[in-house]
Design a protein with these regions (language model features):
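Extracytoplasmic cell-surface/polysaccharide-interacting catalytic and binding patches
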Residues: 2-261
Length: 261
């Protein structure tokens, strides 16, 4: 092989090597993008929460809040029943439902407190609107199934779709809405389920006063690792006036309160 042919051969080989390196870099970058997408999980208990608005990593293991270790409270009190991704709805739970406006239902034990709270909120000049309350097992199953179908339509496998769906819709049996003691309230002039909701007149009033009526903000901004749910400034849970006052004054979530922290 003469010198010129050797030079041409080396140049072609360098070009081929560079092309191979670029190809490997491309596939590595693509793999990282896919992995990053799958690891991100906008955890919300509300199906109308737009994916990506609140993005956090879901807890992989149950947080260190054992449930009911606080000796000062009654672990069997229905006010404090814990339902989250680690504690499913009790099998014998049967809410006594009564109708609300717009077709929603709620447990009769918190009906009067809810109506009074909303009336007083309106008297302050705000315009609260209930956008979700009790959900049956069937309703929750349909919501979850629809979310799975949405991911299947995007090309994910069944297993991947179910995992991704669980990051956005509570698995049936683990949604607090199935208790009948939880309600989602928005401002009639701003009905988006995002963090901007907290700045509305309705949420400003509820954040300061809901505890007076036995309701707590169930998913505070800084408690996601404990609740398993991202910040939801619209989601309120009835626990009774005594417990609500105590939880509000301590600045804890329900999981912390039950653990005695």
């Amino acid at each position: 092989m003469d010198i010129n042919r050797q030079k041409r051969y080396r140049r072609r080989r360098r070009r081929n090597d560079k092309g191979l390196i670029c190809l490997l870099v491309f596939f590595a970058a693509a793999a990282l993008v896919i992995l990053n997408f799958c690891m991100k999980s906008p955890t919300s208990d509300d199906p109308d929460n737009t994916p990506g608005q609140n993005t956090v990593d879901r807890p992989v293991v149950e947080p260190n809040v054992p449930g009911n270790s606080n000796g000062s409270i009654n672990a069997d009190d229905w006010h404090l029943v814990l339902v989250n991704r680690w504690h499913a709805l009790p099998e014998d739970w049967q809410p006594n439902l009564v109708p609300l406006d717009d077709g929603w239902e709620i447990d009769s034990r918190c009906y009067d407190s809810l109506v009074t709270m909303l009336d007083d909120c309106r008297s302050s000049g705000a315009n609260p609107l209930i956008c979700s309350a009790y959900r049956s097992q069937e309703t929750q199953e349909n919501l979850f199934s629809n979310q799975v179908s949405a991911f299947l339509a995007q090309g994910y496998s069944t297993g991947e779709s179910e995992k991704l769906a669980a990051n956005q819709i509570a698995i049936p049996g683990t949604s607090e809405h199935q208790l009948g003691l939880a309600v989602d309230i928005v401002d009639i002039d701003y009905q988006q389920l995002d963090e901007a909701q907290k700045h509305t007149p309705t949420q400003l009033w509820l954040a300061e006063n809901s505890w007076r009526y036995g309701f707590i903000l169930r998913y505070p901004n800084d408690k996601t690792e404990l609740t398993g749910i991202v910040y939801e400034p619209w989601h309120y849970r009835y626990v009774g006036e005594e417990y609500a006052k105590d939880i509000y004054e301590k600045g804890v979530c329900l999981e912390e309160y039950l653990s005695g922290n």
